[in-house]
Amino acid sequence: MKMFESADSTATRSGQDLWAEICSCLPNPEQEDGANNAFSDSFVDSCPEGEGQREVADFAVQPAVKPWAPLQDSEVYLASLEKKLRRIKGLNQEVTSKDMLRTLAQAKKECWDRFLQEKLASEFFVDGLDSDESTLEHFKRWLQPDKVAVSTEEVQYLIPPESQVEKPVAEDEPAAGDKPAAAEQ
């Protein structure tokens, strides 16, 4: 490789001279093997010959260069890019399974709430039998226990009565506290 003159030199050269000197140091592209550095993608349309070309009856030889035309798959590629852009921007209109499940859960909740609020709805299922309020409450409790108030029987079952064993133990505790004080005196 050639050594360039230092920046201290007083002689000024034109840009063309500098480029000529730089390019002379580079290898000549015509000397290299073309097969090793060849670009592999040809950008040639994959459709068979004759489909995209205009056929001219008078000429036996058609020109090798075709006028520019979009590739067959360019519409698909553009559609995929537009889809990605919509997804990135948050404008995606496709319904995902997560959205479907959320919508169905909301609809189910609204249906149950509407059903449980209507007292006449239970009569449709009983078919003429007289149902009292306790039957409806029992049915509501079975469907949605968190929506129905706790009955007095359930409260009594949940809160155990205080046992008689705990009261004497509570009375013995102050007496036990007095004994160590008496022992210290």
From Swiss-Prot:
Membrane topology: Peripheral membrane protein
GO annotation terms (biological process): cilium organization; head development; regulation of clathrin-dependent endocytosis
Keywords: Ciliopathy, Cilium biogenesis/degradation, Coated pit, Coiled coil, Membrane
Protein name, per record: Coiled-coil domain-containing protein 32
Function: Regulates clathrin-mediated endocytsois of cargos such as transferrin probably through the association and modulation of adaptor protein complex 2 (AP-2). Has a role in ciliogenesis. Required for proper cephalic and left/right axis development.
Pfam families linked to this entry: CCDC32
UniProt organism field: Homo sapiens (Human)
Compartment(s) of residence: Membrane, Coated pit
